[in-house]
Amino acid sequence: MQIILRGLVRRVVVAALLAMSAHAFAGPIGYSVRSDVDRKLYRIDMATGVATDIGVTGFSKIEGLAISTTGEIYGVNPSTAQLVKCSAITGACAAVGTLTGLPQLQVNAGLTFASNGSLYLAMNAVVYRIDPATAATAALGGSGPALSGLAGVAPTATCPSGLFGMGGNGDRGKFYCINTNTGAATLLGSLGPSPLDVGLDGDPATGAVWGISNDEPGQVFAVDPVSLSVSNVNTVTLAGKAIGGFESLAIARTGTAAVGDPVIEPAAAAIPDIPTLGQWPLMLLALLLPLAALAVTRAPVTNSLRRHR
């Protein structure tokens, strides 16, 4: 009985912890660099805007961020035209290689992995395809407007590529579909949020496009790429204080995090048959703990009586 109770208690404790962990992040996890302020990588709960400082990137400026299907974070340093890979544990970034063929003067940049698995960069009104292993760059063509952010989700009727972009500066607030063969941007409409610069990325699990504005303070928001409706507008906060200066965004698929990020333990997925919805894990835990304690305290007494018989 004692062993059974201990096993049950252990499983319920794990279930309760998973339930609380799932509640802690109601939306997808985003990553962004506060490049206009401290050059640190931050983890952001996109449902609430609550940010956590991960660490210094080690680069003067990171304009675009993207996350691969394997959870690796990539970024672009415009001043040196480098593709970098960033750690979700320390925030430190390391150069992958030089992006060839880019103009000397780089401005706002958008970076994302599309649903076809390719990595795309928008910079200086040109769209590029990038090899994430070598940083080899191929220009697809002019986008027309200068894009500040790119997001890759599933294709839609109005955007067969599933690659979306958002304008900045003179094209602020405008939402586009990007042709992955020519780089051309087709205007889909205008959004309510219209920052001069924006970080953008998509959640492949839900099809939603997420953004973060380079305002003071910054705001996170979600875009339905079909209806163009905007929701979940929240101010970015750090320890309860509103902050800004973000110019990039990488969104991890809902329920996951970047490689090495301790907020979601990979081992948790290996624990079988433990429901995590609702409040029952905590209630069951409250019931089983007293029973386990009773079994533990009574066991020595029972053994002692047996020895004296």
What are the functions of these language-model segments?
Residues 21-22:
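N-terminal signal peptide c-region/cleavage motif recognized by signal peptidases
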Residues 26-49, 163-165:
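An edge-strand/N-cap motif at the start of beta-rich repeat modules
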Residues 29-34, 72-75, 118-122, 128, ...:
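Conserved beta-propeller blade signature
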Residues 45-48, 86-91, 130-135, 179-182, ...:
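Short loop/turn segments that connect beta-strands within beta-propeller blades
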Residues 50-57, 92-102, 136-142, 184-191, ...:
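A short beta-strand motif characteristic of beta-propeller blades
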Residues 60-68, 103-113, 144-155, 194-202, ...:
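Repeated scaffold domains used in trafficking and secretory/extracellular systems
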Residues 279-301:
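A cross-kingdom C-terminal cell-surface attachment/processing module
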Residues 301-309:
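Cytoplasmic C-terminal tails of single-pass
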